[in-house]
A protein has these predicted regions:
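N-terminal metal-binding scaffold of metallo-dependent hydrolase/deaminase domains
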Residues: 1-40
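Active-site metal-binding motif and surrounding structural segment of the metallo-beta-lactamase
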Residues: 37-53
């Protein structure tokens, strides 16, 4: 379909473009920015006056829950929710049942994602078989089946020698490894950041060193092996400082934070609401400020939803017996726009951290508005507001922001030039 988007404020962080202009789309691609090509006649037009057109958002951490946990979410339901949040490309972590450690599981996920057609899906393969941290998964076969990177989630390698061998092997084939750096022994049994709030509530704590000790080890191993590395879900100011030091000495590492870590702190736990039970945990205001500064400076180049949908029962037990995670991909753009509203980031910088930054971190063909490139576009109204939860597409309603009025409304999400969400 030939489509013209007329009169939008077009922001493309990767090229620095920020102007009111038109976008013309044909055969899944952007064929022109500005004037239409000679002979181009649009079959469909979108009047985008007053709207911002940006690269479709790229989310590096969206649990789709299939296969194995379809009571929490399905590939169809969670990609539909992602499209509503402005997302056109997403990565799904390997913690499925069975684990994403064989090409058969990768192919199943990709087939169901294509069938749903809501967003592009890029699987992250397991670094070790069954995520047990003991035996290396078949990384090359997984890459050939469509996995774009490899990680072990929060299931850490207990044996550093085994991890080192895995990194050496990944480096040989130029594969990207995703680290969720958390020391198993220091974090074990913890439910909240080890500090005043946890003490007051009587909750077992997870010290900041659970992150920083593991992160220091992982950075040294990355330096030794030369593997391409991305650090995911950082939570502490000292953690991002370690990333900044590594980058300053020339280590090519990238990092992301969960959006909710830029908004919430451990003070949210004060009434024991399980909606704020997340792993790794919410930390202090000083940590949140450190994360915000790292996002602003570009030390952290990606913001992800870290979307973890759950069925209602998973959050109904006493705090310690509930399952951690927030369902948030559906609100990715409006929730992120609170950072602009609060003066923490300007709009082009925010969009860079939600599109070009994550795409570059994992070398994904996404995150840009370029002639000849895929027509993956989000159109949003920055002056309107979204009441979170008025419509809800994710199977997981475990979201503490439901009922809040958030800045901006996603009007259209286009994947390969096809409208996958409209509001």
């Amino acid at each position: 379909v030939k489509l013209s988007i007329l009169g939008a404020r077009v922001i493309d962080p990767s090229s620095g473009l920020d102007q009111i202009t038109d976008i013309h789309v044909e055969a899944c691609k952007i064929v022109a920015l500005g004037a239409a090509p000679a002979g181009f006649s649009a079959v469909e037009t979108i009047d985008a006056q007053g709207l911002v057109a940006a690269p479709g958002l790229v989310d590096l951490n969206v649990a789709l829950r299939e296969p194995g946990y379809s009571r929490k979410g399905t590939i169809a339901s969670e990609t539909r929710a992602a499209a509503a949040g402005g997302v056109t490309s997403l990565c799904c972590p390997p913690k499925t049942r069975p684990v994403l450690d064989t090409s058969a599981v990768a192919e199943l996920i990709l087939d169901r994602a294509r069938e749903a057609g809501n967003t592009k899906v890029f699987p992250i393969g397991a670094l070790s078989k069954s995520l047990d941290g003991e035996q290396l998964a078949e990384l090359v076969a997984l890459r050939d089946a469509g996995c774009v990177a490899f990680g072990n989630g929060l299931e850490s390698f207990r044996n550093t020698r085994t991890l080192c061998r895995a990194l050496e092997y990944a480096a040989t084939f130029d594969l990207t490894v995703i680290f969720n750096s958390q020391d198993h022994d220091l974090a074990d049994g913890g439910l909240a950041h080890e500090g005043a709030t946890a003490s007051f509530l009587g909750l077992p704590g997870i010290p900041e060193t659970a992150e920083t000790v593991a992160l220091a080890r992982d950075l040294l191993l990355v330096e030794q092996t030369g593997v391409r590395a991305h650090f995911s879900q950082l939570t502490s100011a000292r953690g991002v400082a370690l990333i900044a030091q590594a980058q300053a000495r020339g280590l090519k590492v990238t990092a992301d934070v969960a959006l909710y870590q830029l908004i919430l702190t451990d003070e949210a736990l004060i009434d024991f609401s399980s909606l704020y039970h997340v792993q790794p945990p919410l930390r202090t205001r000083a940590d949140r400020d450190g994360l915000r500064e790292a996002v602003k400076s570009g030390v952290v180049s990606a913001i992800s939803s870290h979307h973890q949908p759950h069925e209602r029962d998973a959050k109904l037990a006493p705090f310690g017996a509930t399952e951690p995670g927030i369902s948030s991909v559906e609100l990715l753009l409006p929730l992120a726009m609170t950072l602009v509203e609060d003066g923490l980031l300007d709009l082009p910088t925010l969009l860079a951290r939600l599109s070009a930054g994550p795409a570059e971190a994992l070398r994904l063909p996404a995150g840009k508005l370029a002639v000849g490139g895929a027509a993956d576009i989000v159109l949003f109204d920055p002056k309107a507001s979204t009441v979170a939860g008025e419509t809800w597409l994710s199977k997981g309603e475990n979201c503490p922001f439901i009922g809040h009025s958030l800045p901006s409304v996603v009007r259209y999400t286009l994947v390969d030039g096809r409208i996958s969400h409209q509001a």
